[in-house]
């Protein structure tokens, strides 16, 4: 619903034919957030396209190196008055054979739909989630917390980032859902499950998720990437 879109997502294929999807939700005044998210996605994507990487271990090493390079690049830009407060969340997901490997910074999310359930794979790097994990807030209090949008890590911070990495084995019939917090602030995991498993095209599923979140009163940008796992490979 926001007029300026600070979210950005794109898909890239490297020389070994391996796909990576990268999603970012930028922050910062004026256009700083738009620039940060587009820059992080594009810089990482351009670097990925040039690799021959073909194993999850190589992807993990690649993530660890390139995410910090991008963190420093955006941090340096953010020191300029025009880009004050510039930063971005980042979700990057590569699919290698029957495995997905991902890197996570911030409060965008990656989820897996398998069988009857939506599983959130990532844990938000947010103040509210830290308080929740420490037992200082109940899930209900966390939902309605006024500082819900404060994140504890982002690409563009001064300190070295500590990304979360994960690997998930994929099965036919799985869906991977990547989204900015504009979606999950507005609709529940069970609603995401119902829409993604409904009998409509993949594009329509993504569009329906966004529409539902907007109808629920979504005030933020909402960006979604959906991956459907078939018998042979990912679509």
Could you say what each language-model-derived stretch is?
Residues 1-235:
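PP2C/PPM-type serine/threonine phosphatase catalytic domain
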